Amino acid sequence: MITEGAARRVHIIQGEYKVLNDPNAVLSTILGSCVAACLRDPVAGVGGMNHFLLPGSATSPTSGGDATRYGVHLMELLINGLLKQGARRDRLEAKIFGGAKTISTFSNVGEQNAAFAVQFLRDEGIPVVGSSTGGEHGRKLEYWPVSGRARQYPLTGAETQRTVALEQRPAAPQKPVETSIEFF
């Protein structure tokens, strides 16, 4: 077994997902009202994590750079990424984290995010084997995608507020893909 200090850390930010089959890797993220879904296929030895800001739906505006903020888009990308790495849909299992109510005056988007993730996974037939959602404080999450081990650390009030500020920033513009062609 690899020691925690020797683990290869891969940080996931809002709007991203990663799929790995490296037993020495740990995925990490910091969550406020955002949700991270951690999925894996224990037989194929592959797993991944996403980090979404808003639940989204078939009627949500999910085009351009904004698509990566929505759970509906990132859940599909994560599942497809796992399947491309040899996972089978019927063996996938999930853990869900985040969805805190970080500001009392805002609508509870964190609760909506968590409910979306649970419903999406139920609709896809993917069992949720663990979750930690809600509350009033953010959390730092670590997930070992091959073993499925997860660990979270609660954030202090000040850390939660910094996370809220990051979550409210506009999405970063998408960088062109290296193989793209720009027309004038």
Swiss-Prot record:
Source superkingdom: Bacteria
Pfam families per UniProt: CheD
InterPro entries membership: CheD-like_sf (IPR038592), Chemorcpt_Glu_NH3ase_CheD (IPR005659), Cytotoxic_necrot_fac-like_cat (IPR011324)
GO biological process: chemotaxis
A GO MF label: protein-glutamine glutaminase activity
Protein keywords: Chemotaxis, Hydrolase
Enzyme class of the recorded protein, top EC level: hydrolase
Function statement: Probably deamidates glutamine residues to glutamate on methyl-accepting chemotaxis receptors (MCPs), playing an important role in chemotaxis.
Similarity comment text for this entry: Belongs to the CheD family.
Name this protein carries in UniProt: Probable chemoreceptor glutamine deamidase CheD
Phylogenetic lineage: Bacteria, Pseudomonadati, Pseudomonadota, Alphaproteobacteria, Hyphomicrobiales
